[in-house]
Every structure is written in structure tokens, then in C-alpha cells.
A protein has these predicted regions:
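Solvent-exposed loop/turn segments at secondary-structure junctions
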Residues: 63-65, 104-107, 144-148
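Low-complexity, intrinsically disordered terminal/linker segments enriched in charged
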Residues: 138-160
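Bacterial N-terminal signal peptides
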Residues: 5-15
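Short, low-complexity N-terminal intrinsically disordered segments enriched in polar/charged residues
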Residues: 16-50, 54, 156-160
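Exposed beta-sheet edge and beta->alpha loop/turn motif
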Residues: 106-134
Length: 160
């Protein structure tokens, strides 16, 4: 009977996966929040790499992007929307993942993303899922509605 109890305890530990300490969850959430609030919202792009692993990969739209490519995309975004604001609406952590529901807004006053400046404002909601390793963001998946962005900027064909 004792062996059965030990076996059941071991099986439960294996099935439930790795246990992540509450302080690790809180620390990962804080890194994610700081990335959104300090780097993206306040435009401190020079601090971008402080929260990311050197071999970070972004799996968002299109092909996977390296840290350098993701940082270049953020610079291009900030160029196109220099007054961009980013707000963290909700943040959840489980295991080695942190999910952030966010809102971004800004005015398109300069060319960027291969599009002309429109002078129009844009607002959008999105979700980003981060995977952490050793306290740094290792991977990222972001989703948002690009159609809505193009529509708000007046860059979609109108019905004729």
C-alpha cells in the first residue's frame, strides 16, 4: 500500500508538469508589464533587450523574427506613431507563460511599415503571450486586427 501511495504521488507530479514558484510567476508578470509600460508605452526602446533573451524569437505575423528584427519593427512602429500609448488591461501568468491583453493608440504622423503618413489616429486591442526562460522573454506570440488598423488609417479601398 505504501508503494502504491508513493507511485500515485510521483505520477501526479509528473502529469502536472513543472511547478513554478509564486515569486517566479510574479517576477515574470512584472517583466512583461514593465516591457509594455516602460519600453512600448514610454518609448524607451533602448531598454528593449533588457527583458528579452539574446536568442528570443517572435512568432507573430509572417516569418519568425529575431530580437534584432523585433526591435527594428518596434522602432518602425514608434516612427509611424510617435505619440503611441500602450496600456496593459489584464495580465495572467501560468507556468512559464505570461499573457497580456493590451490596448495601443496613436496618431500616424510619419511614414512607417511601408505605408504613408495619414495624420489619422488609430486604436487597437491585442493579446501577447510570452514564454519565459531564466527570467527573460524567450518567445512571443502576438495577435491583433491589422484590418482594423488599415481601416482606421484610411488605407483600405473604398466601395466605388
Amino acid at each position: 500500500m505504501r508503494h502504491l501511495a508513493l507511485f500515485m504521488l510521483a505520477a501526479t507530479a509528473i502529469i502536472s508538469g513543472p511547478v513554478v514558484a509564486k515569486d517566479t510567476l510574479a517576477r515574470n508578470k512584472e517583466v512583461a508589464r514593465s516591457f509594455f509600460e516602460d519600453v512600448l508605452d514610454k518609448g524607451k526602446l533602448e531598454d528593449y533587450a533588457k527583458s528579452h533573451a539574446p536568442d528570443f524569437i517572435a512568432h507573430s505575423e509572417g516569418q519568425p523574427a529575431s530580437l534584432e528584427e523585433d526591435m527594428a519593427a518596434a522602432r518602425e512602429q514608434r516612427k509611424a506613431l510617435p505619440d503611441m500609448r500602450v496600456k496593459v488591461n489584464h495580465i495572467v501568468a501560468e507556468g512559464d507563460h505570461v499573457s497580456v491583453y493590451w490596448t495601443a493608440s496613436g496618431t500616424n504622423t510619419a511614414a512607417g511599415w511601408g505605408m504613408p503618413a495619414t495624420g489619422k489616429s488609430v486604436s487597437l486591442n491585442g493579446m501577447t503571450l510570452f514564454r519565459f526562460e531564466r527570467g527573460l522573454i524567450q518567445e512571443e506570440w502576438s495577435v491583433f486586427n491589422m484590418y482594423s488598423i488599415l481601416k482606421q488609417l484610411g488605407l483600405l479601398p473604398t466601395k466605388g
